[in-house]
Amino acid sequence: MKTHTIGIIMNGVTGRMGTNQHLIRSVLAIRGQGGVRLANGDMILPDPILVGRNPDKVRALAEAHGVSRVAPSLEAALADPFNRIYFDAQTTDRRAAAVRQAIAAGKAIYCEKPTAADTATAAALYRECVAAGLKNGVVQDKLWLGGLRKLRALIDSGSFGRILSVRGEFGYWVFEGDKQPAQRPSWNYRKEDGGGIAIDMLCHWRYVIDNLFGKVAAISCLCATHVPERRDEQGRAYACTAEDAFYATMQTDQGLIVQFNSSWCTRVRRDDLLTLHVDGARGSAVAGLRDCWTQSAEDTPRAVWNPDIEQPIKFFDGWRKMPDDPSHDNAFKAQWELFLRHVVNDEPFPWTLLEGAKGVQLAEKGLESWRKRAWVEVGAIA
């Protein structure tokens, strides 16, 4: 048995998502389990090196989690041939320049979404990787969530019969930063800094819809900035220049209607922060982050409209919770393991930077639809 130790440059992981999901729950968790085992018994052991704009934060993060390697600069990390993978979790407006540095250094590229601030740049990054012969990928974590894996199994088994419609609801209340600290960074609400929920979340819904319900063909979208002023990390008031909610209707290439509401200004009264409600001729399902509930045509209650009496049907009681999958793992970690297998053992990895560009494209088309107050076609990326 051989161990393939592989250096991973992790840029911008001092933020909430980078620290928790990518460093702690993915790369360090993989190290903690001894690596990723290949079919021949060999192991892949990731060895992270941290880099970022704030050296003090980077060093503190490394010390807190036992990471021995910290780079003095991105250039120094890229110059070391031991580091074969470049991972980027910076803010969107900084991503393309750093990824291009990594491409020039011949590194495999793996990065968060949005992969760029616009479709042209996102597509160019993919083409540049291909031209350089470099393996590349984008984080599409929600495909490995427990609830969506169960939903995928229902679709594959034909449980729905003909799927009629899909409704997605995502969001929660993000505090304004005055009475309670905000749960999201202030740049999320400034368009000039790459913020906005459309560019953030439509990138996610593109790959979810494409992989479960058919390719997105058209979109009609309305955005809003419901909270006009918030307070930043220093407690200073600032004007919100980016949208904090969008309400989208999409059509797939199979003619399926998919509605998606996403908001940082909503109080949750549903099963989870994200729910996907799928209605089919033979049954329905509601999937959350971890769980999925189903109702067959035979178990569907006979609803009768009568507002003059208390509702006699307890609608939540008519749904069955699907059993958990014991093999389920953290969604980010699951995709990290696949990407490591791809880089070291050339195993398939279809979630390339082209898929990332498609997400950016849908966000741009959604914003275009909002400006035009019209349906906008979503075509192939040239």
Residue ranges and their predicted role:
Residues 1-65:
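N-terminal Rossmann-like dinucleotide-binding module
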Residues 3, 134, 161-165, 368-382:
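C-terminal capping/lid region of NAD(P)-dependent oxidoreductase domains
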Residues 69-81:
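Short acidic low-complexity segments
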Residues 84-85, 91, 96-143, 158:
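Beta-strand-loop-alpha-helix segment that lines the small-molecule cofactor/substrate pocket
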Residues 88-89, 252, 261, 280:
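Short, well-ordered coil/turn residues at beta-beta hairpins
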Residues 111, 136-138, 167, 260, ...:
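Hydrophobic residues in well-ordered beta-strands that form the structural core
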Residues 142-240, 373:
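Predominantly a Rossmann-like dinucleotide-binding segment in NAD(P)-dependent oxidoreductases
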